Amino acid sequence: ARDGYIVDEKGCKFACFIN
């Protein structure tokens, strides 16, 4: 897994964990 960012439909960025 690695750290990453995803953006929701409102354009907000938040930390996530990408496997």
From Swiss-Prot:
It is found in: Secreted. InterPro entries: LCN-type_CS_alpha_beta_dom (IPR044062), Scorpion_toxinL/defensin (IPR002061). One of its GO terms (biological process) is defense response to bacterium. The keyword Disulfide bond applies. It comes from the Eukaryota. One of its GO terms (molecular function) is toxin activity. Its main location: secreted. Expressed by the venom gland. The keyword Cell membrane does not apply. Has the structural arrangement of an alpha-helix connected to antiparallel beta-sheets by disulfide bonds (CS-alpha/beta). Belongs to the long (4 C-C) scorpion toxin superfamily. Sodium channel inhibitor family. May block sodium channels (Nav) found. Reversibly modifies the firing of DRG neurons by causing membrane depolarization and increasing the number of action potentials. Shows antimicrobial activity against the Gram-negative bacteria K.pneumoniae (MIC=64 uM), and only a very weak activity against S.aureus. Does not show hemolytic activity. This is Toxin Cm38. It comes from Centruroides margaritatus.
